[in-house]
């Protein structure tokens, strides 16, 4: 079994996250995807609670499952002492799935901070790493020079920051997030300007 591990804050999950999961199914190829909701110790918190981010990640997993892929969500990292680290998540996943081939999915923006992550070599020992980089951006020397990283060009003109900004200014989120996530954001009153 090939298991893709997709960690992030998912504050909120958006159509780019959905597309990354679907690309992972086709290009890695991944049989299952594990969406791990976490805090990012390198970024400030943005507004949704842990419970709300887990709820929205569950909605994202339902969208992924509708396409025929097997996706599940874990809040394991949120239950760990803060900050949690990707290497610890991968150790946990490895203990639960000892025979699985693991691939860690990360966006290029997150990978730029990879040298600052806890135990990068441990991460490479536990999993392959697939970096999704936005098309049209120059590939960094760091990514291009690392044979342990699989680079996947990817079009996703949306980010969680954009979704939060649109929500704060009352702009429509349609087309930026799955419909169910949009309804959740609206019903919970998330990301409104203070």
UniProtKB/Swiss-Prot annotation:
Gene3D superfamilies with a match to the protein in the record: HUPs
EC number: 2.7.7.18
GO biological processes: NAD biosynthetic process
Enzyme class: transferase
One example GO MF annotation: ATP binding
Keyword Nucleotide-binding listed: yes
Catalysis: reaction(s): nicotinate beta-D-ribonucleotide + ATP + H(+) = deamido-NAD(+) + diphosphate
Pathway: Cofactor biosynthesis; NAD(+) biosynthesis; deamido-NAD(+) from nicotinate D-ribonucleotide: step 1/1
InterPro entries on file: Cyt_trans-like (IPR004821), NadD/NMNAT (IPR005248), Rossmann-like_a/b/a_fold (IPR014729)
Keyword set includes Acyltransferase: no
Keywords: ATP-binding, NAD, Nucleotide-binding, Nucleotidyltransferase, Pyridine nucleotide biosynthesis, Transferase
A matching Pfam family: CTP_transf_like
Role of this protein: Catalyzes the reversible adenylation of nicotinate mononucleotide (NaMN) to nicotinic acid adenine dinucleotide (NaAD).
The family this protein is said to belong to: Belongs to the NadD family.
Protein name: Probable nicotinate-nucleotide adenylyltransferase
Organism the protein comes from: Chlorobium luteolum (strain DSM 273 / BCRC 81028 / 2530)
